[in-house]
Amino acid sequence: MDDSTDDDSYHPRKHYAYDRQVSSSRWRTSREYIRGPGPETHTTESAQDGQDPPAGVYSYGYFSGSGNDPQVQGHFVPEIQKYNPYVIFKGEQLPVPIWELPEEKVQDFHDRYFIAKDKSRVEARKTLNRLLEGNINTIERGHGYKFNIPKYTDNMEFNEEVKVSLAKAGKTISRSFCNANQREVASRTGYTIDLIERTLGAGLNISKRTVLYTNKDLFGDQSKSDQAINDICALTNIRRGSLGIIAAEKGIVVGNIFLELTNGKSISCSIGVQIPHRLDQIKDVCVEIGSRNIEYILVVEKHTMLNYLLEMDYHTNNNCIILTGCGMPTLQTRDFLRFLKQRTGLPVFGLCDPDPEGISILATYARGSCNSAYDNFNISVPSICWVGLSSSDMIKLNLSETNYSRLSREDKTMLKNLWQDDLSDVWKRRIEEMISFDKKASFEAIHSLGFDYFATNLLPDMINKVREGYVQVQEKKEPQDTEASED
């Protein structure tokens, strides 16, 4: 599954937060950098005004007051750099964060795989013009468009270094107007290239839904216009956002943080806000003044989960950021999660229903999807840990049989396909348990034990169990020095 089902008609409940002007003088006197979970501060010349800390090394927050003895208001507690058995990948070799790869290594990935890049609108438009101009001769001869598009949906491999599924370079598929079987798809591709080029030239963005309705007779339905957009991203090696294509964003983020924008304003996330379309307009992510340390990011499968946790004030009581894609996440939601992970260094935990679709959604955040294979490198978060809910979690609760439904044939096929991947032992075991249990459920069934039970008891316990996974591996990997203990 992927994000191709984005629909502009979908409107989840929106929590609008206020914009406020952040005083530049307050920002200059209060911004400091923190290393690790302790209160150690760094005020060296390398942490000058407006300069971001090195990615993956520092976390940062707000302090009240000024001078040499600031009071900590709260900061981001970075993830322990140890393997956790609840991640999706097998083996204890940690993935190298994409943003920490040296430039020559990134180039090596681009040579070996089809990976889309961020480009300026001017560069993107020039690339599209070259594609159109390259077809002028064939069009004049009456042959129409012809494009050789990289194969990405069925030409993927799992890269062990970054723990992400990527599309291998070297294979292409033809879209030719001369071929009767390819004529329609070639026409859709050529039309969409021209549409995007004109939109970029006008300095505008266009939604995926609008692309469909600019020529409904040509596309027919959303899946075909989405395919044309994805093909163009692969053909040009340009990311969708750089082409001015936006989807109806349904993702929401909640937490005692605010997003500092490049225009000097900020957006509070304390009561929930829709995920911004343009990450390039976010300058920083900061802890709200007066808030405690933020300890982790919790990704939840669906809108009802987020509404429930928001009602229980879970993000404040448990010092976390909550994010949902309201089902299968869009590219923007996945990119925003990667952005939060990169900027904060926080561990990421995933919560889903005990059903095949929930597992597939978490796997998409971690590894990516086939339809976005050209962008998986940029937006995947392989370190996400599957907190629950699993079949064994539900069995232990002794819920009534009326809370379950049988797995369908499609459910079993999805589980078997997931199981065949090279997954960690925990993921494999949980999938096997679900197949054996032959039932699925929804987290709402747990409310029969009390409305607040899940938020105040079960979920914190499950997260603590996953967090202990780091410690267990650490003790296993680093036994105590016997000579030192004798001293």
Curated annotation (Swiss-Prot):
Q: Which family does it belong to?
A: Belongs to the TOP6A family.
Binding-site residues for Mg(2+), renumbered to this chain: E301, D353
The name of this protein is Meiotic recombination protein SPO11-4
Paired cysteines (S-S): none
Q: Encoded by which gene?
A: SPO11-4
According to its UniProt record, which cofactors does this protein need? Mg(2+)
Q: Where is the active site?
A: Y213
Q: Name one GO molecular function term.
A: protein homodimerization activity
**Cellular component GO terms held in the UniProt record:** nuclear chromosome
Whom does it interact with, and what assembly results? Homodimer. Interacts with TOP6B.
Q: Which CDD domains does the entry mention? A: TOPRIM_TopoIIB_SPO
Q: Which residues form the Topo IIA-type catalytic domain?
A: 119-252
Which species is the source of this protein?
Answer: Oryza sativa subsp. japonica (Rice)
